[in-house]
């Protein structure tokens, strides 16, 4: 069912502790059970499984429950041992897990959506289960009565969700590339603002209530940090992945962001430094360096008897430049560019060697990651992917945590 990986920890990369195998289809979500050597998984094969580590070092399912529809999302509240499972048919089912994690009792079904559930969160204080779905809406339902409290529709599929429990604000990412901030009330709501910055669909969100930072990952391979608490519209761009960003997790203790992409890439970003905002791209009818006209500037082309050029942009200064004035490429990590991007020749000369020092570390998960979650107290991460395999990692070598891991890599 599951293998224990016998490898010696390396100081510079995540340590693979265990593989959990046995699902017959894509694993949609996997969550580590706090203070236990256990993992809860939800899969497209219509099963919910609770895996506990045995004396042999292998993981075996102590709970194996078959649902009526493929499982698409999951939320687990450890203190109350309540689990909420979103399904492809739009329903959310609540279960209660026994103290020994060997039994799971059905509680109730919530008719939350008309289509696939994409994300779920549970708020104990208000007794709300909040969810998003491919029916283009966010809904919040009362877990006491099972009744619908509110619903808001977007223009495209709602793909991911984060919730601020203290202020009752919800952040919803959608397939159009927008993030909507809503204030949820008992029977009403208000749309606060919409955040736009990605060029692809939003695939993952993470909200840090301490620093009031929102992180978003998207299919455009990039991550944006939105400084909500600063109230100045400050954003930071992080580009280091070569495929769509599938999951992100911010470690408040060490000020590090962990991100995973569909190609198996795992990145750890240092956010405990003063990063620079990437500039807005400037628009011009001619190169802002040599003043040669761009190809749509017919008048200047006619007046100067020259051919029009293609417009490019310097990633460091944002100026509109032609190809001849931007022949160089450079990384510029302080602005979030971890690999080489186009810069104008004058900006290239201003970048020193020390400016190219990476501010992130990159690692290989060796499977197509579709979901990731972490247990901060133990420095553990669990990833799952389209290969039906769940992997448990010790992240302490790369996230700077000195906390002892509960998963042995003997």
Segments (PLM) and residue ranges:
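Per-blade loop-tip surfaces of WD-repeat and WD-like beta-propellers in eukaryotic adaptors/scaffolds
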Residues: 2-16, 50-71, 78-82, 88-114, ...
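C-terminal interaction modules of eukaryotic adaptor/scaffold proteins
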Residues: 248, 260, 382-410
């Amino acid at each position: 069912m599951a293998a224990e990986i016998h490898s010696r920890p390396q100081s510079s990369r995540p340590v693979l502790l265990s593989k959990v195998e046995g699902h017959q289809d894509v694993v949609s979500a996997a969550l580590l059970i706090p203070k236990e050597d256990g993992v809860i998984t939800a899969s497209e094969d219509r099963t919910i499984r609770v895996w506990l580590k045995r004396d042999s070092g292998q993981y075996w399912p102590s709970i194996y429950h078959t649902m009526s529809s493929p499982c698409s999302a999951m939320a687990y509240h450890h203190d109350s041992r309540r689990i909420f499972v979103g399904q492809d048919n739009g329903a959310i089912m609540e279960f209660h897990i026994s103290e020994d994690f060997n039994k799971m009792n059905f509680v109730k079904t919530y008719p939350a959506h008309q289509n696939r559930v994409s994300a779920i969160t549970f708020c104990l204080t208000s007794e709300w289960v909040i969810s998003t779905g491919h029916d283009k809406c966010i809904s919040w339902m009362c877990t006491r009565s099972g009744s619908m409290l509110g619903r808001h529709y977007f223009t495209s599929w709602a793909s991911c969700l984060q919730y601020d429990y203290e202020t009752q604000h919800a952040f919803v990412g959608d397939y159009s590339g927008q993030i909507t901030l809503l204030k949820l009330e008992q029977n009403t709501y208000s749309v606060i603002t919409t955040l736009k910055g990605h060029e692809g669909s939003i695939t993952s969100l993470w909200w840090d209530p301490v620093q009031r930072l929102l992180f978003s990952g998207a299919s455009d391979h990039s991550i944006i940090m939105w400084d909500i608490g600063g109230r100045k519209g400050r954003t930071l761009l992080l580009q280091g992945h070569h495929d769509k960003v599938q999951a992100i997790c911010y470690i408040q203790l060490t000020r590090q962001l962990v991100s995973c992409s569909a190609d198996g890439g795992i990145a750890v970003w240092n956010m405990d430094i003063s990063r620079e905002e990437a500039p807005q791209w400037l628009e011009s009818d001619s190169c802002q360096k040599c003043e040669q006209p761009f190809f749509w500037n017919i008048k200047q082309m006619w007046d100067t008897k020259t051919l029009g050029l293609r417009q490019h942009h310097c990633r460091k200064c944002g100026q509109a430049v032609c190809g001849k004035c931007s022949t160089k490429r450079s990384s510029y990590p302080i602005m979030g560019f971890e690999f080489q991007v186009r810069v104008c020749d004058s900006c290239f000369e201003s970048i020193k060697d020390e400016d190219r020092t990476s501010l992130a570390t990159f690692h290989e998960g060796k499977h197509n990651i579709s979901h990731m979650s972490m247990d901060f107290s133990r420095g553990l991460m669990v990833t799952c992917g389209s290969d039906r395999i769940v992997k448990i990692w010790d992240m302490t070598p790369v996230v700077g945590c000195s906390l002892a891991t509960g998963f042995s890599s003997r």
